[in-house]
């Protein structure tokens, strides 16, 4: 793009949604405020009487509201905050997804294990409300949606009638916020599967520039809290996490995904719960055909 808001002026949306602002892709910006400013450019192309839907829990909420008001947009906030127009009152994980309460809707069940995805669903509900569409049918349809491959899909390897391994495939991409969310959700899931061993497979988060080392090391405390039975890392930055934790957690590091692809089968056994999370460029998704082959082989042998 050559000019600010070039794309949004082509689209001329009636409703613009910003789900989050974080330090994702920060190597292309001077700081996080620049990221917030770049995202706020979507408001510049809004049609007259347009609506800006903004996450009320985000640190850049006030900045985004100010930018939206410059174009006289109607502000619609969504999130956990009490000031939200669409308020999340409860959001909890269970073994099969998430249960959410918002506004006057109680115990709505979604098939998304990742609470960030559930929060994004509430952003969609905010759009529906602004369009003044009936929500009942939409809620029924959304509750049937399943996570996509690489976006929190849950796969099960059945070894026999009593033993299985669960894989949470969040390998499509990662940034600092989504990585922390994935680890937090995995920790909640780990508590629900106490009898299972835990395996965390993480790849580097890319495009973080000079902040890369620090941001990766910020994951150390939550990984200590999860205390997985096995930590596998792919990339030079997650190797630094490995180096910090290898005295207390069983760890193996790989600089390239091709190395782990050759060895992954040796780590897979019954009664595990496994998380895959990393930037797309680290290639963790290349492990999924191996897992799916194991699923098929076991099904054929049953």
Q: Where are the regions that the model predicts?
A:
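ATP-dependent carboxylate-amine ligase
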Residues: 14, 28, 48, 69-74, ...
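Beta-strand/loop nucleic-acid-binding surfaces
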Residues: 108-111
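Glycine/charge-rich, flexible interdomain linkers and switch-proximal surface loops
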Residues: 56, 84, 156-158
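Short, charged, surface-exposed secondary-structure boundary motifs
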Residues: 25-29, 82-91, 261-265
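Flexible active-site lid/hinge loop adjacent to a nucleotide/diphosphate
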Residues: 1-67, 207
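Acidic-glycine-rich active-site phosphate/pyrophosphate-binding loop
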Residues: 87-106, 153-154
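Residues at the C-termini of beta-strands that transition into short coil/loop
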Residues: 78-81, 92, 235, 255
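Short, ordered loop/turn segments at secondary-structure junctions
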Residues: 21-23, 80, 205, 236-237
């Amino acid at each position: 793009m050559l000019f600010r808001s070039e794309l949004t002026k082509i689209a001329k949306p009636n409703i613009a949604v910003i789900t989050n602002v974080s330090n994702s892709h920060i190597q292309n910006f001077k700081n996080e405020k620049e990221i917030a400013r770049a995202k706020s450019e979507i408001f510049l192309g809004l049609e007259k009487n347009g609506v800006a839907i903004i996450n009320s829990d985000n640190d850049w909420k006030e900045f985004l509201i100010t930018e939206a008001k410059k174009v006289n947009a109607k502000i619609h906030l969504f999130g956990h905050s009490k000031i939200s127009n669409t308020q999340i009152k409860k959001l909890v994980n269970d073994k099969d997804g998430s249960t959410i309460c918002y506004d006057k809707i109680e115990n709505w069940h979604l098939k998304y294990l990742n609470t960030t995805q559930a929060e994004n669903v509430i952003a969609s509900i905010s759009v529906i409300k602004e369009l003044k569409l009936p929500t009942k049918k939409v809620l029924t349809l959304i509750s049937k949606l399943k996570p996509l491959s690489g976006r929190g899909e849950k796969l099960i390897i059945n070894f026999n009638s009593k033993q299985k391994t669960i894989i949470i495939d969040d390998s499509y991409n990662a940034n600092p916020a989504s990585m922390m969310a994935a680890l937090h959700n995995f920790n909640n899931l780990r508590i629900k599967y106490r009898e299972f061993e835990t395996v965390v497979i993480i790849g580097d988060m890319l495009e973080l520039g000079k902040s890369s080392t620090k941001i990766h090391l910020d994951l150390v405390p939550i990984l200590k809290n999860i205390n997985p039975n096995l930590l596998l890392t792919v990339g030079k930055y997650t190797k630094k996490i490995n180096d910090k934790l290898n005295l207390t957690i069983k760890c193996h590091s790989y600089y390239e995904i091709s190395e782990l692809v050759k060895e992954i089968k040796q780590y897979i056994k019954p009664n595990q719960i496994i998380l895959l999370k990393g930037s797309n460029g680290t290639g963790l998704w290349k492990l999924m055909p191996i897992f799916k082959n194991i699923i098929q082989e076991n099904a054929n042998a049953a």
